[in-house]
Amino acid sequence: EHGPNFVKTMARLAGERDTVSVVSDQIGQPTWTVDLSRYIAEVLGAEVPFGTYHGTSEGETTWFGFAQAVFEELGLAPDRVRPISTDEFPQPAPRPAYSVLGHNRTDAVGVARLPHWRVRLAETVADVVRDTR
């Protein structure tokens, strides 16, 4: 049901390691494709002015905070997740430190916002746990 994703990776690493190191200085909005798909369909189906609309979940967090939330949802100690800086985790492409997008245009045209990322996280973790049994 869910392809490869951060939640599955954290769940797998939780079973393999005592601690997991995750970047703590990049802030974003975890967003699920099921929510984004609904949002895109709603925007395309509505008579809204041409322009840019940000389809991201409510709320913001760091990758570190997201990983801690995954551990919490799994019933594991979130202090098993250790914060590291972007400099300590080399990636092939640079990532922005702050990639939170506003929803002003969405609100202005009456399109429903995406749910808070923690709502979908709880559902996803339940699915991941069910699928691994």
Language model features by range: what are they?
Residues 10, 40-44, 67-70, 103, ...:
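Hydrophobic "lid"/C-terminal helical patch
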Residues 4-8, 64, 68, 100:
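Short, surface-exposed alpha-helical segments at coil->helix boundaries
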Residues 94-133:
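C-terminal amphipathic/interface module of NAD(P)-dependent oxidoreductases
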Residues 1-28, 34-35:
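NAD(P)-dependent short-chain dehydrogenase/reductase
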Residues 39, 46-93, 133:
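Mid/C-terminal beta-alpha module of Rossmann-like enzyme folds, strongest
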Residues 36, 40, 55, 66, ...:
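Non-catalytic, hydrophobic alpha-helical segments
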Residues 1, 28-31, 61, 101, ...:
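Residue-level signal for the nucleotide or nucleotide-sugar donor/cofactor binding architecture
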